[in-house]
């Protein structure tokens, strides 16, 4: 099979029997013939030259979309599978802002060895009604579209993958076509990045109209630009008007659905610092702006550009920078990677930590990280036993934890007068979660540590509240897990860190004070393993001795859960791997009386909690 990567620099078209389709409208059953493309490697090419003897597959791709990039290797494999069977593959880039320089650089980075063209006028995209990258179209020998949609079902939603592909939709359609059979599933929804059509913005008709410069840019600066700027994790930037109108319709959809910015706790159930949840007024502003034609407005209304730290440290230069001891290679495509890396700290005295900041060595693949400490040397042994940098499973009981990071989160200093103890002669163990980007990558991330500059009056402890369940039966779509813990001394809660794995669906924690008052701690109703982080309360919450902290969660181990790592579902047991399951809520807290701190540490252990759970009633 000949692989023709047709990413058009200039597209000259002459359509004989095909009128343009409305984006998203089905083109299945329509005949497509007679267009010509400019191929920068071989000159002008006609559809007849590009078409396969038995069938032609057209796939729309983008250099910026990570989901599109992740299909480059599978598409090359598809090409090899059908070589010699009269099927040809044409890949088209329909994105107006991805010019020759960007495409050439992308081809070099991803080691694409084929001619590349760009559909600047989006003529072919309009012809087929394509709306997403990646999106595939299967055209038979007579020029009739027989299938359109996704390549396979590896993505549940944008950037959220299954553990394994369960249906190769495009491959199945090709097999059925070549066998002379009807296409069983002729159309599926393609998940990916939208193909941005040209927008003709309107001028504001009156002084009260919502404009980009006066109203929208400030929202993007405050809520989006941490990630949506060059060198960060987001697939595109939102730094100016041109970039914003390109993605405006998609921005409106994701903010209305509250898919972005990512913020999991539901409103009103706990009050947190630096909430990334958009206010209803902000959503309304974006919606009104799009509805009114996306006017730019008066240039004098544009706020000054947001300034970001040039050295990458948002809290300023750290007192200590701990860098992974060696680079780790991330494969191009496949399952996400969970990996632990040991970094020696090298202090012969305890240190008080007031803030920890993570700097991704490769923002394209780093998704989240958790920072443990180990004073036993067990992590070093696991690292030594694994031939690759780091090791693949926890396999040890951490001595403590000093924070974590996820895409889009900001470093959070501890309240004044508090600190986390970094034990002497210990190691930092960084648990990294990597997303493959579509090409081989390397990462060597760093953690910046800030030490206390004044005496620490209160030591922060992580209080784990365990959900006591050790088996998650297959087929059950609502598995309830509960746990509770009686606070042994007077404390103040400063943060909460929920933790479950792939089967998790809901997670809630409350605190019931001795007088019966119930305080909401956190409630997440759409758990996502890929978006877990610590949440810091706006104000420390007093929890008197005898307070009961309750945990309640639900998991789905049925085939209806697209995040289920097992197909078909199987019995899942408690364990450290993401394919195992667990349920823990970590409460960051300080003891009101320093003399009680070691009692808090002693009684927070799982065995102590298990014993206490037998005697819940006072």
Where do the PLM segments sit?
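Bacterial N-terminal signal peptides
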Residues: 1-14
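N-proximal helix/coil linker or "cap" segments that precede and/or mark the start of modular domains
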Residues: 12-34, 48-51, 184-186, 190-203
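A short beta-strand-turn-helix
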Residues: 35-56, 205-214
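Short active-site neighborhood of thiol/selenol oxidoreductases, capturing the structured segment around
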Residues: 48-69, 174
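Structural microenvironment flanking redox-active thiols in thiol-disulfide oxidoreductases
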Residues: 69-110, 117-127
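Thiol/selenol-based redox catalytic cores and closely related redox-interacting motifs
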Residues: 119-196
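Aromatic- and Gly/Pro-enriched helix-to-coil junctions and flexible linker segments
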Residues: 187-347, 425-431, 436-438
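Beta-strand-centric surfaces of beta-sandwich/beta-rich domains
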Residues: 265-272, 302-352, 357-492, 498-617
């Amino acid at each position: 099979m000949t692989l023709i990567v047709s990413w058009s620099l200039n597209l000259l078209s002459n359509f004989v029997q095909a009128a343009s389709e409305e984006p998203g409208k089905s083109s299945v059953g329509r005949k497509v013939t007679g267009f010509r493309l400019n191929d920068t490697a071989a000159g002008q090419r006609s559809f007849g030259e590009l078409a396969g003897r038995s069938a032609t597959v057209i796939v729309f791709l983008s250099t910026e979309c990570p989901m599109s990039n992740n299909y480059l290797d599978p598409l090359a494999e598809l090409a090899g599978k059908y070589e010699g069977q009269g099927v040809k593959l044409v890949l088209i880039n329909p994105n107006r802002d991805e010019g020759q320089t960007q495409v050439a650089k992308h081809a070099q980075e991803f080691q694409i060895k084929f001619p590349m063209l760009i559909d600047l006028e989006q003529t072919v995209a309009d012809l087929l009604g394509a709306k997403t990258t990646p999106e595939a179209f299967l055209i038979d020998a007579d020029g009739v579209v027989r299938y359109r949609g996704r390549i396979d079902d590896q993505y549940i939603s944008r950037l959220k993958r299954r553990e394994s592909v369960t249906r190769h939709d495009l491959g199945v359609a090709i097999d059925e076509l070549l066998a002379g059979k009807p296409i069983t599933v002729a159309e599926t929804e393609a998940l990916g990045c939208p193909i941005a059509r040209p927008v003709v913005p309107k001028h504001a008709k009156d002084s009260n109209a919502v404009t980009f410069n006066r109203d929208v840019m400030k929202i993007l600066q405050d809520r989006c630009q941490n990630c949506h700027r060059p060198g960060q994790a987001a697939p595109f930037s939102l730094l100016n008007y041109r970039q914003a109108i390109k993605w405006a319709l998609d921005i409106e959809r994701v903010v209305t659905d509250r898919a972005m910015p990512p913020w999991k706790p539901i409103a009103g159930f706990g009050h947190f610092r630096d909430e990334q949840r958009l206010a209803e007024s902000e959503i309304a502003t974006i919606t009104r702006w799009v509805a009114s034609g996306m006017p730019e407005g008066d240039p004098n209304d544009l706020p000054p550009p947001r300034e970001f730290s040039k050295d990458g440290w948002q809290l300023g230069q750290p007192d200590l920078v701990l860098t992974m001891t060696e680079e780790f290679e991330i494969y191009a495509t496949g399952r996400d990677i969970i990996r632990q890396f040991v970094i020696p700290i090298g202090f012969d005295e305890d240190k008080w930590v007031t803030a920890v900041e993570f700097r991704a060595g490769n923002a394209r693949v780093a998704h989240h990280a958790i920072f443990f400490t180990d004073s036993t040397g067990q992590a070093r042994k696991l690292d030594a036993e694994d031939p690759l940098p780091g090791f693949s499973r926890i396999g040890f009981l951490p001595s403590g934890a000093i924070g974590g990071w996820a895409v889009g989160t900001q470093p959070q200093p501890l309240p004044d007068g508090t600190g986390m103890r970094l034990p002497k002669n210990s190691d930092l163990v960084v648990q990294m979660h990597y997303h493959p980007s579509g090409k081989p990558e390397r990462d060597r991330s760093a953690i910046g540590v800030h030490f206390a500059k004044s005496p620490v009056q209160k030591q922060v402890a992580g209080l784990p509240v365990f959900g006591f369940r050790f088996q998650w039966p297959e087929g059950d779509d609502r598995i309830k897990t509960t746990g509770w813990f009686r606070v042994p001394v007077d404390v103040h809660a400063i943060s909460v860190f929920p933790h479950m794995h792939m089967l998790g669906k809901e997670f809630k924690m409350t605190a019931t004070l001795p007088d019966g008052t119930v305080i909401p701690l956190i409630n997440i109703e759409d758990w996502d393993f890929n978006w877990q982080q610590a949440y810091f309360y706006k104000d420390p919450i007093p929890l008197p001795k005898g307070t009961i902290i309750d945990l309640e969660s639900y998991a789905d181990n049925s085939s209806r859960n697209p995040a289920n790592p097992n197909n078909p579902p199987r019995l899942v047991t408690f364990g450290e791997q993401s394919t195992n399951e667990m349920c823990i809520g970590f409460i960051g807290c300080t003891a009101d009386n320093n003399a009680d701190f070691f009692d808090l540490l002693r009684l927070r252990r799982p065995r102590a909690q298990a014993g206490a759970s037998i005697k819940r009633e006072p």
